[in-house]
Swiss-Prot record:
Record flagged with keyword Signal: yes
Name of the featured protein: Apolipoprotein M
Disulfide bond sites: 23-167, 95-183, 128-157
Alphabetic keyword roster: Disulfide bond, Glycoprotein, HDL, Lipid transport, Secreted, Signal, Transport
Species per Swiss-Prot/TrEMBL record: Homo sapiens
Function as written in the Swiss-Prot or TrEMBL entry: Probably involved in lipid transport. Can bind sphingosine-1-phosphate, myristic acid, palmitic acid and stearic acid, retinol, all-trans-retinoic acid and 9-cis-retinoic acid.
A Pfam family assignment: ApoM
Annotated effect of mutating residue 148 to Q: No loss of glycosylation
A Gene Ontology BP annotation from the UniProt entry: negative regulation of plasma lipoprotein oxidation
Coiled-coil region(s): none
Length: 188
């Protein structure tokens, strides 16, 4: 009898605790514009990589040697395409250029990376002004990435990202140092 009462109390305690400390919901962005053919222009342009979160630190290891990353997202030359250019400033000062092509998936919020059929990217809004969050999944990894229009967003933005991703089972967190000047983005 004691065990049943104890189990019932723990059960109700769990319900109350869960209702008080629910993770905040994040609203998913659509990858298609109002006309169903284009990526929303508000998400095009320059972005800075601020932070990452993942279930394990190994899923973020690719960012360990990075000081900062600046991206430019532009509409592609073909419909349903996005061109992403980046310049990565490594902690040793080197600048490493990168390019990707995302393919929009009609009727879905997924972005698919050209040449990486296993990789799926989903976009989410951020409560932080000028912010956006990505969820990247691929073979053997899942990570959340925080981007902002400013290289130094308010600390509150990073804390909210960390809190949200910890609710989503991310145990590892990485904040880019952003101590060095960002590398210049090339136009090609």
């Amino acid at each position: 009898m004691f065990h049943q009462i104890w189990a019932a109390l723990l059960y109700f305690y769990g319900i109350i605790l869960n209702s008080i400390y629910q993770c905040p919901e994040h609203s998913q962005l659509t990858t298609l514009g109002v006309d169903g053919k284009e990526f929303p222009e508000v998400h095009l342009g320059q972005w800075y990589f601020i932070a990452g979160a993942a279930p394990t630190k190994e899923e973020l290891a690719t960012f360990d040697p990075v000081d900062n990353i600046v991206f430019n997202m532009a509409a592609g030359s073909a419909p349903m395409q996005l061109h992403l250019r980046a310049t990565i400033r490594m902690k040793d000062g080197l600048c490493v250029p990168r390019k990707w092509i995302y393919h929009l998936t009609e009727g879905s919020t997924d972005l698919r990376t050209e040449g990486r059929p296993d990789m799926k990217t989903e976009l989410f809004s951020s409560s932080c002004p000028g912010g956006i969050m990505l969820n990247e999944t691929g073979q053997g990894y899942q990570r959340f990435l925080l981007y902002n229009r400013s290289p130094h967003p308010p600390e509150k933005c990073v804390e909210e990202f960390k809190s949200l991703t910890s609710c989503l089972d991310s145990k590892a967190f990485l904040l880019t140092p952003r101590n060095q000047e960002a590398c210049e983005l090339s136009n090609n």
